[in-house]
Regions:
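Active-site/ligand-binding-proximal alpha/beta "capping" segment
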Residues: 216-270
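Short, acidic/turn-prone active-site loops that include or flank metal/cofactor-
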Residues: 84-86, 107-109, 176-178, 201, ...
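Amphipathic alpha-helical repeat scaffolds
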Residues: 62, 151-159, 271-277
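RNA substrate-binding interface of SAM-dependent RNA methyltransferases
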Residues: 4, 71, 102, 125-223, ...
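Short, hinge-like loop/turn segments at secondary-structure boundaries
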Residues: 96-97, 122, 188-192, 233-235
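Short, charged, surface-exposed secondary-structure boundary motifs
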Residues: 89-91, 113, 207, 226, ...
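Arg/Lys-rich RNA-binding interfaces used to dock onto structured RNA substrates
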Residues: 2-153, 176, 287, 294-304
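Structured adenosyl-cofactor binding patch, chiefly the S-adenosyl-L-methionine
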Residues: 124, 162-166, 177-194, 251-304
Length: 304
């Protein structure tokens, strides 16, 4: 017969706590099995500029775009993933564990929500970058980009990507230019939508009233060669429609300041360059001149 423990003895140790099971990948994912799902309906509605403008949202289609947005710290409003081709262990699912609106979507429904010919594997609804004015950006710019009547969303998106990659301070959209948050523009920008300030609805007169910079306008003929122009000083590069050019916008931008017209030399009889290609060539020439002079642009490019 065992004796009872003495009054001074220590209590028996508590049994060790059971470890919590790890959270399974994709916990919290829901199945969107109906086209009436709110996130699917919103993704379809955001194909329209009016809805994008009212809601200040955009659609990113594909893994690369969603990854770029997440890398820039953008928090999605909703994440839609292909239930058959991706699954719950996708890294984008892990990166958005705190997001309530995450759905596994049958491919047929995901295709209906997308503007692509082939449905993406991942689609995210994202907040647009904040509305900006000239008070919010570097001014005068080392290099700013002004688009007047560039109506194709793909060209706008490509110019956003190029401007960000070549160190421009900002990109401003003038009258007649496509929405930089159009799905095609977002795809062409490949994540640069979140990397460079974008100013919307900037009339030439709004820019002309500001000082401290030169205007360099791209024209199809009659201008100086880009390497003959001073592209080192603070400047705004103005690009227009491929057919109509800058039109009257160049005169409005001048407003008493120096305006330099540049023309990229081409082979005889060749068609004019695509506006995105012309913009890339001119921005690259500005980078080259700055590198040779030892001056940097927005702090990311130096003479070396």
């Amino acid at each position: 017969m065992s004796r009872p423990p003495s009054r001074g003895s220590a209590p028996a140790p508590a049994p060790p706590a059971r470890p919590r099971p790890p959270t399974p990948p994709g916990a919290g994912l829901r199945l969107a099995s109906s086209p009436r799902n709110p996130a699917l309906r919103l993704a379809r509605a955001l194909q329209a500029k009016k809805v994008r403008r009212e809601r200040r949202l955009l659609v990113a289609e594909g893994e690369d775009l969603v990854d770029a947005a997440l890398a820039h710290g953008v928090e999605p409003v909703a994440l839609l993933i292909d239930a058959e081709r991706v699954g719950a262990d996708d890294p984008r699912v892990r990166a958005t564990e705190g997001l309530r609106e995450r759905y596994l979507v049958p491919p047929r429904l995901l295709a209906q929500a997308s503007g692509l010919a082939a449905a993406p594997r991942v689609l995210a609804i994202l907040p647009q970058p904040p509305v900006r004015s000239f008070r919010d950006v570097a001014f005068p710019p080392a290099l700013g980009l002004y688009l007047a009547g560039v109506a194709d969303p793909g060209n706008v998106g490509t110019l956003v990507r190029t401007a960000a990659g070549l160190g421009a301070d900002w990109l401003a959209l003038g009258p007649g230019s496509a929405d930089a948050f159009h799905p095609r523009a977002v795809r062409a920008a490949m994540g640069a939508t979140f990397a460079i300030p974008i100013l919307e609805g900037v009339a030439p007169a709004d820019l002309a009233t500001r000082g401290g910079f030169a205007v360099v306008g791209a024209v199809p003929r009659g201008g100086v060669a880009p390497w003959e122009a001073d592209l080192v000083r603070p400047l705004v590069l103005a690009l227009g429609a491929e057919r109509g050019g800058l039109g009257g916008a160049l005169e409005e931008l001048a407003a008493g300041r120096e305006v330099v017209q540049v023309t990229i030399p081409q082979a005889p009889g060749a068609e004019s360059l695509n506006v995105a290609a012309a913009g890339a060539a001119l921005m690259a020439e500005s980078v080259r001149q700055r590198a040779r002079s030892g001056r940097s642009g927005s702090g990311t490019l130096s003479g070396r």
